[in-house]
């Protein structure tokens, strides 16, 4: 089922972008790229149902308006498989979708590495809503409750096989996701870009159903806006939609997000109110491109931004700082605005936002991934000036939420000067094995690596591989001898062995020459 083309796409997608939006990219991918031809041969020659899959890692992620959603990170090999499988049917799914003015979100246009070369589609959604509001008197606003977690996998298979020319691709994806879910038949991973494609597949017949009721609508993911000149007609359609979603998908609408308003009220309350106007003003001030891009921001995007920016650093720094203060004064987290500001600061390596963000780190938890990536982009001297603030945050337990810990551990273990601070070092080494291993490597902490050898084979997958990685802190003789020993153990998985080979070979990174050879 997996092909050379689909796996090459998955490789480039994960290399240039991310495996999930909510976790740092794991080091295991470096090991996989190091043995890529062997990995690819293994995945192509092994039937999908015989490939070992493991439940994803999960995090509670704070929503902008309170409450949590569960987000995921797949095992590295599972992430490759998932991306490759969805790539196989992505073009067929896009072909079956309604026109972009209706199904606005994430138009699927695969390139060599991206599912969504045309962007998120949010500006198109906004324009469609404004146009339809000018034509009609009323609008029904609604969205699907807990959408990703409520999707039935069998419905995904049916939706794909109804539109795809690839035999059994839908049932193959269903079976793969069932194994990821430990046989649960409901829910797709939150975070991977491939899940966005599957969500749009599910929504194909829902768009068709609304159109069959002879009304106009616009949809952005699971946010639906239906327009009519009749209040009564919208009430009837709402009832029909509730039944259709239940009967065909076992989905339900969010009561608190469902309303019927005049289009004038809708425009004023949702698109053209004072808050929205100020928000657009902020985005214009910082020259943000598309602030609604959640998935697929390339890791080399900074270079593109650098080439296009003619604003002086001091001017841009003050503009971004002012924008951040104004955004905080909204009184709640606006994900689009905060992401746009922080990503703009990251692209230009502007350090002046860092202290403001860190002193109110709890406010920024819904965008903690962007915060960490921004801080990591700063010059070493700028980070060093923040060492005491980081230390205080660690001592005062301000970085203990699970999502914050994942990203702050990743950040702090990339900067050895920060680890010289006792409170920071204690924070990192008292965390999970992955963080401690990363710290041991960057600090060349042989004692930690030697201890890690003692129970390495009894550890679960992520921690086992992290401990293998930490062996790079040891002498070549000790490292290679131990790796040769554990490679004979029958509990070692294929990914374990590729990590061993990578560590034994000195943990090489892909250089510019390698990239040219690989990607042309």
Identify the function of each model-found stretch.
Residues 267-280:
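Short, low-order "capping/linker" segments at domain edges
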Residues 230-231, 265-267:
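Short secondary-structure transition/capping segments
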Residues 63, 257, 262-264:
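A general secondary-structure junction signal
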Residues 180-182, 263-265, 272:
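Extended charged low-complexity segments that act as oligomerization/scaffolding linkers
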Residues 116-221, 225-260, 279, 284-465, ...:
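Conserved polymerase palm-domain catalytic core
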Residues 1-167, 178-192:
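Conserved two-metal-ion catalytic palm core of "right-hand" nucleic acid polymerases
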Residues 483-520:
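Eukaryotic acidic, Ser/Thr-rich intrinsically disordered low-complexity regions
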């Amino acid at each position: 089922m997996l092909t050379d083309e689909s796996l090459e796409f998955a490789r480039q997608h994960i290399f240039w972008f991310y495996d999930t939006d909510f976790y740092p990219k794991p080091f295991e991918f470096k090991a996989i790229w190091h043995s890529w031809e062997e990995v690819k041969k293994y995945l192509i020659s092994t039937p999908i149902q015989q490939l070992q899959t493991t439940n994803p890692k999960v995090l509670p992620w704070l929503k902008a308006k309170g409450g949590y959603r569960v987000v995921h990170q797949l095992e590295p090999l599972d992430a490759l498989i998932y991306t490759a499988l969805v790539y196989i049917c992505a073009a067929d799914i896009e072909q079956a979708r309604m026109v972009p003015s209706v199904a606005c979100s994430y138009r699927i246009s695969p390139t060599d590495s991206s599912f969504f070369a045309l962007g998120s589609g949010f500006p198109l959604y906004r324009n469609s809503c404004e146009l339809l509001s000018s034509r009609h008197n009323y609008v029904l606003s609604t969205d699907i409750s807990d959408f990703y977690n409520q999707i039935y996998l069998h419905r995904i298979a049916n939706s794909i096989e109804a539109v795809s020319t690839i035999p059994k691709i839908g049932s193959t994806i269903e079976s793969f996701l069932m194994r990821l879910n430990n046989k649960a038949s409901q829910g797709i991973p939150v975070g991977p870009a491939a899940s966005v494609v599957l969500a749009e597949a599910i929504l194909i017949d829902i768009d068709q159903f609304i159109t069959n009721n002879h009304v106009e609508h616009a949809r952005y993911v699971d946010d639906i806006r239906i327009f009519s000149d009749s209040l009564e007609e919208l009430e009837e359609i709402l009832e029909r939609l509730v039944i259709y979603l239940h009967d065909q998908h076992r989905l339900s609408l969010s009561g608190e997000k469902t309303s019927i308003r005049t289009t004038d009220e809708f425009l004023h309350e949702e698109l053209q109110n004072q808050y929205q106007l100020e928000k657009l003003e902020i985005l214009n001030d910082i020259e943000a491109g598309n602030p609604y891009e959640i998935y697929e921001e390339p890791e080399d995007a900074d270079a593109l931004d650098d080439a296009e920016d003619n604003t002086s650093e001091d001017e841009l720094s003050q503009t971004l700082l002012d924008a951040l203060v104004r955004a905080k004064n909204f009184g709640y987290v606006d994900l689009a605005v905060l992401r746009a500001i922080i990503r703009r600061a990251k692209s230009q390596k502007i350090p002046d936002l860092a202290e403001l963000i860190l002193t109110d780190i709890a406010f920024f938890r819904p965008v903690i991934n962007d915060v960490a990536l921004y801080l990591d982009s700063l010059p070493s001297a700028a980070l060093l000036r923040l060492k005491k603030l980081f230390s205080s945050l660690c001592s005062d337990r301000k970085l203990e939420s699970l999502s914050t810990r994942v990203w702050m551990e990743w950040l702090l273990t990339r900067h050895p000067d920060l680890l010289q601070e006792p409170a920071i070092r204690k924070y990192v080494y008292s965390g999970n094995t992955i963080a401690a291993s990363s710290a041991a490597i960057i600090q060349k902490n042989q004692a930690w690596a030697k201890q890690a050898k003692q129970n390495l084979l009894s550890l679960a997958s992520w921690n086992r591989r992290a401990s293998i990685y930490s062996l790079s802190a040891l002498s070549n003789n000790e490292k290679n001898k131990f790796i040769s020993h554990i490679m004979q153990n029958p509990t070692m998985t294929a990914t374990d062995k590729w990590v061993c080979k990578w560590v034994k070979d000195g943990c090489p990174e892909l250089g510019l020459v390698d990239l040219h050879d690989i990607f042309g």
